[in-house]
């Protein structure tokens, strides 16, 4: 075998110019596997080779293992099988924030504030178990049972519950409510399998409450399924209006057009984006802008306009290969420029925008004449070159989230303080504030809570800590704490109702919508 391999390798070196590139790769893998001085992991060797090839193409072509593929797809699939709880880890213990409404845990009597101590008679509390391992133990096939040992405040002994795992929904519409009379607000966190149905349910609810105009919040929306975005856009456009088209070297132009069956062709629409709005979110914003159907408010979006085709392998792993570009109806390419193989420079783009002042001033952004396009109805000037440039620019406000605020958030001081506080005062808060509006109007975060956070920041010797920085941080910290407490008592809808009153992009949309 050794002689044979040496002969093959020798022949390869002599006939290198005639050798097919794929054959060269096969021979290299064979030689390493059979001749290398130490034992090698053949699977990892192949996976690294695939990743190496894709790395030289573009920033979004990628390879994922079976485990990674499942993790990538799960948030977009609309559901998973599990016990149905929202939880957070507090001092090595799983604290239940909320059981999913009508989910398997709620049905057997598990409550918000309960702590899961054992799973199938195995301790998961106080053993420094990885979060991923805890989730693996809690999840399982639909219909299977799991025994949970629960510690409940005020009860000395452990309580045991047998929970039957079930299909647990994963929602992509984070919040919807009437933000002002006649003006509805819907926040879409991502575009998944159930996003369109969730969106239309929100629309139906808001219309019964008097909605005429709509704010669609796509801030921090990283994208997802193209078809989910297309179906939502169709609701706003006339028959045969172009939504988006794709085109690539080996892919002919493919157009997506409105069917003309939309229910939202009247009323004003405001689409909110920022530098983290990407992909399907940019397709929605670009179509609404180019068709003059909506006003785009915020900051230039991320600029991810590459079409990926999934190529599945038998072991569950996958390649997502870029096969085309997305173009808005006016012909703008959404994808921002990149150098092949230089993913580090691409990853630094947002930081570059920050340093160059683009996030603070629209005047710092300069477009060449070749990047100017016209909208299809009013013939307004819009710009290509990567991302969607808003019609109304809203600068980033660095005074809201100070450096100290970011540092204490990164250390989980804010979320941990909230969890401890709600755990201690849950029943008191529920009894005192039976309705969210009462909480919204009358609740004030206690000074002891913010004092304890700043004291911990001082103890940890955070670099940004100072009395002056604490004073600057306090107003927004109190807003965030109030919003997190509302989330833990009610849900994400109430969280955004509080946070949005301080969100400059949302407030600019409200200002324009109520003129």
Label each residue range with its predicted role.
Residues 36-97, 143-175, 499-510, 515:
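Extended, small/polar residue-biased N-terminal targeting/export presequences
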Residues 280, 292, 299, 303-371:
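Polar, glycine-rich mid-to-C-terminal structural blocks
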Residues 113-115:
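Structural motif
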Residues 27, 44-48, 52, 231, ...:
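Amphipathic alpha-helical interaction segments
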Residues 333-334, 338-515:
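Conserved functional hotspot residues or short segments at active or partner-binding sites
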Residues 15-21, 25, 29-42, 65, ...:
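Cleft-lining beta-strand/loop regions that shape enzyme active-site pockets
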Residues 1-19:
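Bacterial Sec-dependent N-terminal signal peptides
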């Amino acid at each position: 075998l050794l002689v044979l391999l040496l002969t093959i390798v020798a022949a390869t070196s002599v006939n290198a110019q005639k050798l097919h590139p794929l054959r060269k790769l096969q021979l290299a893998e064979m030689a390493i596997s059979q001749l290398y001085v130490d034992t090698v992991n053949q699977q990892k060797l192949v996976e690294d080779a695939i990743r190496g090839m894709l790395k030289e193409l573009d920033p979004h072509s990628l390879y994922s293992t079976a485990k990674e593929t499942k993790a990538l797809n799960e948030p977009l699939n609309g559901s998973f099988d599990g016990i149905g709880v929202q939880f957070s880890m507090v001092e090595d213990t799983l604290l239940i924030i909320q059981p999913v409404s009508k989910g398997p845990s709620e049905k057997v009597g598990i409550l918000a504030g309960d702590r899961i101590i054992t799973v199938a008679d195995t301790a998961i509390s106080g053993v420094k178990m990885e979060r991923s391992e805890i989730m693996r133990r809690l999840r399982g096939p639909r219909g299977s049972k799991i025994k949970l040992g629960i510690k409940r405040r005020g009860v000395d002994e452990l309580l045991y519950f047998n929970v039957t795992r079930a299909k647990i929904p994963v929602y992509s519409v984070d919040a919807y409510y009437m933000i002002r009379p006649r003006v509805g607000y819907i926040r879409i966190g991502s575009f998944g399998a159930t996003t369109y149905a969730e969106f239309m349910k929100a629309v139906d609810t808001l219309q019964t409450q008097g909605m005429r105009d709509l704010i669609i919040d796509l801030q921090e929306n990283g994208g997802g399924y193209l078809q989910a975005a297309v179906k939502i856009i169709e609701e706003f456009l006339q028959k045969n209006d172009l939504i988006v088209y794709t085109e690539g070297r080996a892919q002919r132009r493919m157009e997506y057009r409105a069917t003309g069956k939309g229910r939202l062709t009247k009323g004003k629409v405001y689409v909110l984006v920022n530098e983290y709005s990407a992909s399907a979110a940019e397709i929605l914003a670009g179509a609404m802008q180019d068709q003059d159907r909506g006003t785009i408010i915020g900051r230039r979006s991320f600029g991810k306009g590459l079409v990926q085709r999934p190529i599945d392998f038998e072991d569950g792993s996958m390649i997502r290969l870029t096969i085309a570009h997305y173009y808005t109806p006016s012909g703008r390419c959404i994808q921002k420029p990149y150098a092949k193989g230089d993913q580090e420079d691409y990853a630094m783009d947002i930081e570059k925008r920050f340093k160059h002042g683009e996030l603070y001033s629209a005047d710092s952004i300069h477009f060449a004449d070749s990047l100017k396009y016209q909208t299809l109805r009013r013939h307004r000037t819009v710009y290509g070159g990567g991302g969607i440039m808003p019609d109304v620019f809203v600068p980033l406000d660095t005074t809201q989230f100070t450096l100290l605020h970011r540092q204490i958030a990164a250390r989980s001081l804010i979320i941990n303080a909230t969890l401890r506080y709600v755990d201690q005062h849950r029943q008191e808060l529920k009894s005192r504030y039976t309705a969210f509006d009462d909480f919204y109007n009358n609740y004030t975060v206690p000074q002891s809570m913010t004092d304890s956070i700043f004291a911990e920041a001082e103890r940890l010797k955070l670099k940004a800590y100072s009395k002056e920085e604490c004073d600057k941080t306090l107003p927004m910290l109190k807003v965030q704490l109030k919003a997190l407490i509302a989330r833990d008592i009610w849900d994400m809808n109430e969280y955004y109702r509080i946070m949005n009153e301080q969100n400059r992009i949302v407030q600019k949309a409200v200002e324009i919508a109520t003129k």
